[in-house]
């Protein structure tokens, strides 16, 4: 494991514990021996108020490579979501998560989670990752929002 990656992740965890957006969750997983695994984060993103996503809490895994922050983490909804920019595997398609697009080492976990939260209600139709969600979003917005509301209800924490 890279000392640079672990150092950066420890720094980010410390900053996150002091101040993070309401409702967002980001915690490292635990190794079999009980120690923290900073390279594997369990996250949760609440749907924004006033959107069809409201009420849902969507679980996401954030996996960091040894060369983080030179390369972005892989972000994957577990289970996968119905969304134009989420691959059927659950992996999020977002330009700031792609090394050859908009990733920069200065981008933080907080910025990534806020970016994904924003993406939920504002899909990028120029970069679709899921054919069914993309097609319904483009052709029948009412049906799309109905499905999103049902999904938010399904993933409601209460």
Curated annotation (Swiss-Prot):
Known EC number: 2.3.2.-
Major enzyme class: transferase
PROSITE patterns the UniProt entry points to: UBC_1 (PS00183), UBC_2 (PS50127)
Active site positions, chain numbering: 93 (glycyl thioester intermediate)
Domain of life: Eukaryota
Pathway the protein takes part in: Protein modification; protein sumoylation
GO terms classed as biological process: cell division; chromosome segregation; protein sumoylation
GO terms, molecular function: ATP binding; transferase activity
Residues flagged as site, Interaction with ranbp2: 4, 25, 57
SUPFAM superfamilies in UniProt: UBC-like
InterPro entries, per the entry: Ub_conjugating_enzyme, UBQ-conjugat_E2_core, UBQ-conjugating_AS, UBQ-conjugating_enzyme/RWD
Region (Interaction with sumo1): 13-18
Subcellular location: Nucleus
Any one of the GO CC terms: nucleus
Keywords tagged on the record: ATP-binding, Cell cycle, Cell division, Chromosome partition, Mitosis, Nucleotide-binding, Nucleus, Transferase, Ubl conjugation pathway
Site (Substrate binding): 100-101
Pfam families attached to this UniProt entry: UQ_con
Boundaries of every UBC core domain copy: 4-157
SMART domains registered for this protein in UniProt: UBCc (SM00212)
PANTHER family cross-referenced by the UniProt entry: UBIQUITIN-CONJUGATING ENZYME E2
Assembly: Forms a tight complex with RANGAP1 and RANBP2.
Role played: Accepts the ubiquitin-like proteins SUMO1, SUMO2 and SUMO3 from the UBLE1A-UBLE1B E1 complex and catalyzes their covalent attachment to other proteins with the help of an E3 ligase such as RANBP2 or CBX4. Essential for nuclear architecture and chromosome segregation.
Similarity comment: Belongs to the ubiquitin-conjugating enzyme family.
Designated name of the protein: SUMO-conjugating enzyme UBC9
Organism: Pagrus major
Taxonomic lineage of the native organism: Eukaryota, Metazoa, Chordata, Craniata, Vertebrata
């Amino acid at each position: 494991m890279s000392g640079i990656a672990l150092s950066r992740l420890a720094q980010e965890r410390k900053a996150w514990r002091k101040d993070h957006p309401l409702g967002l969750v980001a915690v490292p997983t635990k190794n079999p021996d009980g120690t923290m695994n900073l390279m594997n984060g369990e996250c949760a993103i609440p749907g924004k108020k006033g959107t069809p996503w409201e009420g849902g809490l969507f679980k996401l895994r954030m996996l960091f490579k040894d060369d983080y922050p030179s390369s972005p983490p892989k972000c994957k909804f577990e289970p996968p979501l119905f969304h134009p920019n989420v691959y059927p595997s659950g992996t999020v398609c977002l330009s700031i998560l792609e090394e050859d697009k908009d990733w920069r080492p200065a981008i933080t976990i907080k910025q990534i989670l806020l970016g994904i939260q924003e993406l939920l209600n504002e899909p990028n139709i120029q970069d679709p990752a899921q054919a069914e969600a993309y097609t319904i979003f483009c052709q029948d917005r009412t049906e799309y929002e109905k499905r999103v509301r049902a999904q938010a209800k399904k993933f409601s924490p209460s």
